Amino acid sequence: MAIKMICSDIDGTLLQYGKKELEDEIFEQIRELHRRGILFCPASGRQYTSLRKLFAPVADCCVFLCENGGVIYKDEQCIAKNPMPRALAEEIANDLWTRSDGQGEVMLSGQNTAYLMERGLGMLKRIQFIGNNYQIIHDPSEVPEEITKVSVYLHEGVESYTERFVPRWKEANCAVAGPYWIDTTFANKGIGVRSICKTLDIALADVMAFGDNYNDVSMLDIVGVPYIMDGAAAPLREKYPNHTPCPEDVLREFLKQN
């Protein structure tokens, strides 16, 4: 096995919650990987605009798995997209909005714009913080393009709503995506990684990946070398034998040994 691509979740993995910028070390590591012919893949629920800004110094060395696999970008071009059936996306959005007890706000993701149904609970500030393109809407039918992901932001945390929404929307890969987010999509990170590997002729066994949450499982389950973060939930730490406090530690050793 020779590693040909390294994928990493962003929020909670490469970028600890609350931070806005990556450490300089990861940029140097990505450049060195690129020199050795190894591709780096940010794999995130974020949109392309946000990810490209975050990785601006090394963006040309990366392939971007955006919207949890809903959209894939390489060389500033969309090379794959997995939209949701329109009627289902609107149904899910309405359900997340009406059944979150007034405590949830809904985001519908297009190819490169986030469409926000907000209640002033903090979602807008978070979207502005990470640098997404966005537009305020009042109904899902107002989204003027294909929808790749529907999410609910729960400002008091997901704990009280996980059982309410995740089983109900299992057909749309409903999963907890962080302390405040639950996502639905017809893609997932595993589908996105498979799409990249097929397009670029990379074997899944030759991929290393890092994640910290349940929406990373589809990716971690299919790659040759999966790593889970030390701060992940106990069931995830038990599922994967390779643990790390941060991807940079693993990449530092990888570059020394290869």
Language-model features: locations:
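Short active-site oxyanion
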Residues: G37-C41, D60-C62, T148-V150, A205-V207, ...
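Asp-based phosphoryl-transfer active-site loop
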Residues: K4-K19, L220
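Short hydrophobic/aromatic-enriched beta-strand-loop microsegments
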Residues: C61-E67, N82, R126-Q128, C174-A175, ...
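Hydrophobic packing residues within well-ordered alpha-helices of enzyme cores
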Residues: L51-F55, T162, M219-L220, L236
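Short, structured coil segments at secondary-structure junctions
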Residues: P57-D60, N68, P167-K170, I222-V223, ...
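Mg2+-dependent phosphoryl-transfer enzymes with acidic/Ser/Thr/Gly-rich catalytic loops
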Residues: M1-M5, E23, I182-N258
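Active-site phosphate-binding/coordination module
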Residues: E21-G122
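Conserved acidic, metal-coordinating active-site core of Asp-based
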Residues: R99-F210, D216-M219, G231
